[in-house]
Amino acid sequence: MATMDFSKGHGTQNDFVVLPDLDVRVDLEPARVSALCDRQRGLGADGILRVARAGALADAGVLGALPDGVAAEDWFMDYRNSDGSIAEMCGNGVRVFAHYLKASGLESKDEFVVGSRAGARPVVVHGYDATHGDVTVAMGPIKDLGTSSATIDGRVFAGVGIDVGNPHLACVDEHVTAEVLSALDLSVSPGFDPGFFPHGVNIEIVTPIHDGGVHMRVHERGVGETRSCGTGTVAAAAAALKFDGRDEGSVLVRVLGGEVQVTVEGGEGSLRGPSVLVANGTISDAWWQSLV
């Protein structure tokens, strides 16, 4: 093929290159993914969302087996971090993925399942057009992994390990205000306990709940600081509720890229927020092949 189609989108400024690859012909070798996501030599993105049916990915050997609850006919979000590593789940990515399916005409229903390596994620597309979408994602179980800590700017932040399909360390600190949060240096990877998180961890620094909301910044494994992290907002909301002495509730989570609404109920989380599709185009196959 001479070119590859792509779309560029973001969920609260957590941005992605969307690659429709229904026949699973594109080789997402890490060096290629890294180049495509590079903001100087590629398109620039926090990650790549490959669009294909789960069964097609399994047949091609991309998936060893279908994850829990995912059927062969389900659309599957094959997510790659900007360094080329594979991630189990991305909440902002699912919103953009679902919006793309609707806007491109690949999906006709407003409620459907998106498969991920963390399992099936039911979505509801409340409204959309070619540019803007409003999507809720059922994020699945929220698992408390126990307490740990992160070191940022020479300061130790106590936090709770939370699994939302991928590992997080959400640190709620009573001394952290929005102003203190904005001054933190997240350009350097935070320190964490590799024995507690042997596969790395996404780290959130979170303010306590005030007027129903929190502020959050996040350092994502394999990426660095991003302007938003969907699973991170769920982890942050769950940790903030726990800090507030509650197991359930709704929290408005404010990130650098905007706001999302997280609801925690019955040990599971849901995430509602915007999606924006900003561009469509083609990638030169000659450039792509030169990356090998």
From Swiss-Prot:
It holds the Pfam family DAP_epimerase. The active site is at C90 (proton donor), C229 (proton acceptor). Substrate binds at N14, N81, G91, N92, N166, N202, E220, R221, G230, T231. It catalyses: (2S,6S)-2,6-diaminopimelate = meso-2,6-diaminopimelate. GO terms for biological process: lysine biosynthetic process via diaminopimelate. Catalyzes the stereoinversion of LL-2,6-diaminopimelate (L,L-DAP) to meso-diaminopimelate (meso-DAP), a precursor of L-lysine and an essential component of the bacterial peptidoglycan. Homodimer. This is Diaminopimelate epimerase. It comes from Rhodococcus erythropolis (strain PR4 / NBRC 100887). The lineage of its organism: Bacteria, Bacillati, Actinomycetota, Actinomycetes, Mycobacteriales. The gene is dapF.
